[in-house]
């Protein structure tokens, strides 16, 4: 039937002489939607018309057979397919009316900003259909067979911008930026303050466009059959009460005898569920995306086969001054990187010729360069920001990465949630396409599904060790929540800790706080109350964080007060209680925090302490076995003791905690949308610290948060 194009896209008609327009045909390629998605959505073509640049005959979609000497080359990913279209459509690209938010690559806790950046960045690109290819209902899963690796050319046009740092125009923020770059620490407080309520920046028009976009994405996914689930379920016969261990022994698989000997020395007798499910697939040479609960042996699951690849690789000539790095492990935080390297050294006990090196922020770049040059470095464990520094500044480092045979993204969801997507894409482009890639994570949100497009091969396997209908937390962990006004939180925290200590001789407690400076405040308070306390957060130097982390790992009778730098993957054995004070960022963060206890099948306890206006968060946990607990009685003497201890906490720490608290909750959409109410709650928090008047906040910061001239705030 004849079609009349709207005036705004009619100019394109002459270039479509070979284009076949199909009506209500789901098997054709919606090419114009990749180019004019916003325009066509505006004119309501999305649900009626599909476009194909194919001749008017039936052909398999996206099946490219390129003959070279009679052989069929390896199939390309959708990203590479669209790379070939880039020149053709370049003349028709127009800039989006929405800017792309950039996040600092080295910010380890810039989670909220990272998600918003990715959301806008994806909508801002012509290849948005590619990035959203796994769309649709998250519960429906996705087809892992259609994914592929991206070539270096896929990111050629983005290399110059992938690692460009944000420059703050205001002189008052430049000093903070320099300090953050020097320590590669996540300055969660300043970041959240500067970002403000970023969710409110989306207009109603943006939200309507998102709905149209999601509808188009789902139709495209359905048209190509990408919504059909292709998942390997790990031993579905096991119920939720089963141990995380299996009966399968490591020597059941063809592993190096020296590796098996090291495994035995480490006390590992049988495999965990995730190890049993992934090892045979990886040994076949396939890529893997694995979802498993925290504390179930994911680190060994990816390290052991990585070591096997290194063992089977031909030895490097001693004359080679730049020997290749064979296995590259990317971790989101320094603590996780150090932990993975320690585990690797344990497994390499009888492989003296194989070396593991760690490159993380907070240490001198020159020392790392020297260590990698003088010591064996077949396996490299790194955080994304520091790895980027070496790619840019270490001579010959990029050449060494050309030898990578195994790439591992540990805690993949956290890497992307922190805004490291650009770093990950750059790293993928720096290593060979012919490699094995493993993504291990406790959760698989949309961001992880998107990175699969560029990181994994089309024939990769999705191993799901968290079955549908089972809970995502360990059954042996007793979960409770308590609701109390802010003015009672400090007294309740002290009472809960004191009762737990009295009932557990070998107590080992982790207290999670919302921000680094609130963590500092709580640690100071508990120290004034004569509790045995240590603190870890992004404001502490790396040497201190490593020392405290090792001390807490080996000790008992200790309380660790921490921000979310300790929330993911860090293995602290025998933690008896995890106490979360205040609103977690989201459901996944609650699960990860809780996962610090109940590890390796041991029992544990988790308490979530919220204010009445934070109670809405519990609706996201309704499928978890968390129960409401009555508040313990607090005697007047305890209240006086806590108030006296608060008086001894330094005023500057209270001021910093107030500002950080305000910035954190300003970024929570349910709370930050009402600025007047937000300020009332912040001042309630100020009074809970024993302050009669709320601390003054710089006008620049208030402006960045969108809180200028809000009643109840003091500016300076």
UniProtKB/Swiss-Prot annotation:
A GO molecular-function descriptor: ATP hydrolysis activity
Catalysed conversion reaction: ATP + H2O = ADP + phosphate + H(+)
CDD domains attached to this UniProt entry: DEADc_MSS116, SF2_C_DEAD
First-level EC class: hydrolase
Domain Helicase C-terminal: 497-643
PANTHER family referenced in this protein's UniProt entry, alphabetically: RNA HELICASE
Protein name (database record): DEAD-box ATP-dependent RNA helicase 31
